[in-house]
UniProtKB/Swiss-Prot annotation:
GO terms for biological process: translation. This is one of the proteins that bind and probably mediate the attachment of the 5S RNA into the large ribosomal subunit, where it forms part of the central protuberance. In the 70S ribosome it contacts protein S13 of the 30S subunit (bridge B1b), connecting the 2 subunits; this bridge is implicated in subunit movement. Contacts the P site tRNA; the 5S rRNA and some of its associated proteins might help stabilize positioning of ribosome-bound tRNAs. GO terms for cellular component: ribonucleoprotein complex; ribosome. Part of the 50S ribosomal subunit; part of the 5S rRNA/L5/L18/L25 subcomplex. Contacts the 5S rRNA and the P site tRNA. Forms a bridge to the 30S subunit in the 70S ribosome. This is Large ribosomal subunit protein uL5.
Amino acid sequence: MAKSAYEPRLKKEYVERIRKAIQEQFSYANEMQIPRLDKIVINMGVGEATGDSKKPTVAAADLAAIAGQKPVITRARNSIAGFKLREGMPIGAKVTLRGVRMYEFLDRLINIALPRVRDFRGLNPKSFDGRGNFAMGIKEHIVFPEINYDKVDQMWGMDIIVCTTATNDDEARALLKEFNFPFRQ
């Protein structure tokens, strides 16, 4: 893939400022030890998919608009009679962002989408998994500017997982704080 001349704002900030700040804070001997963003996974589970098979397709179209990349329709791995769910039924959509699209999505998430969330008090600082990854949930997908509120017939929630190369939660928390993640105090 040819290298494009465009470099996202957050990636440029990471290279110029954030890497140096993290290296000074944790005093790494090697530059490759400095944690960086690896990928962002966005998952949209559609609970009502058992009744209407078109709902995951509609959710996938909204997710494609938000992420700028075609999502994968996720299917049920096994049948659950209580949920009227059969193996192989479409139950949601997910997309994995890397590179330029990852930094662009992160920029929109931090600066546009999260401030538009109702009653937002900050991200939970305990949502790290112990290996340097951060998970969060958004209850309404209409907080993203790509979604036209008038054309939405149903609100979808989504899970957003930010995967980093950090080895522990403290390194990942420091990295995401440098990216201006609004953590709760």
